[in-house]
């Protein structure tokens, strides 16, 4: 049986902090698959228990839930239990990569470059002076397990550190304080093990926050952004990072240059945005993959 003969569900929405983005991605993906003749139904998981997918006759899932159970391995495990193939990474890679702290530990273990960090756990005392002595200023403070820059603060003074940590702790029990990387910011899509052109992100404000990602029309995206040599360099790094954490199908890996122009790994997005602002389709388009074809390819890679 071909995939076009199967009943496919696009899962989107949900209840994570990234719900609104996922609704937009879900609408775009559902429309693309319908235009290609697939038997597809969009399902907002906020109002639909996942365990009822089998009763509904669903045979395959396109997962476009951002954050929460859609990216932390819970949905992936449930679908495997039901025997339903799904797009994107498996249980282990999904669980690990939503946790920025453990992702960075895995990269560091094999010698891949990533910004220096200090970990703060809920209930621990925060020694701001000691942290700044180690990392310098400015620093970025972020929850370990949130996406879309939710709860992220750029801290420029010692006095700002504690309030920033307290804000991040609203979203997670583990918070990362990371050394600032002064260079350019890139996001690098990977499709079926092939690294696509890096997209340089130039936000209007201090950094690429939620507003810059999904609301602002003033964020600039440059693609292709690198010379052939630099693209080859970042591709080698990103491919290694992708393989270390066990990604499959598709993912997007964020990278930043330090002051000397060296690439540093930031984080993995195992369920990349697919909205009008989204980076993955912008990059794919530059190598001749239109939006509908990209969506279809991701679906074909489901397992």
UniProtKB/Swiss-Prot annotation:
Signal peptide range in chain numbering: none
Gene source species: Actinobacillus pleuropneumoniae serotype 5b (strain L20)
Entry's localization field: Cytoplasm
HAMAP family according to UniProt: Dala_Dala_lig
Ligand binding (ATP): 132-187
Residues reported in the UniProt entry to bind Mg(2+) 2: 267, 269
Coiled coil: none
Binding site for Mg(2+) 1: 254, 267
Enzyme class: ligase
Predominant localisation class: cytoplasm
Cofactor: Mg(2+); Mn(2+)
Protein name in UniProt: D-alanine--D-alanine ligase
InterPro entries for this protein: ATP-grasp, ATP_grasp_subdomain_1, D-Ala_lig_Van_CS, D_ala_D_ala, Dala_Dala_lig_C, Dala_Dala_lig_N, PreATP-grasp_dom_sf
Domain of life according to the entry: Bacteria
Keywords, alphabetical: ATP-binding, Cell shape, Cell wall biogenesis/degradation, Cytoplasm, Ligase, Magnesium, Manganese, Metal-binding, Nucleotide-binding, Peptidoglycan synthesis
Occurrences of domain ATP-grasp (ranges): 104-300
Catalytic activity of the protein: 2 D-alanine + ATP = D-alanyl-D-alanine + ADP + phosphate + H(+)
Segments passing through the bilayer: none
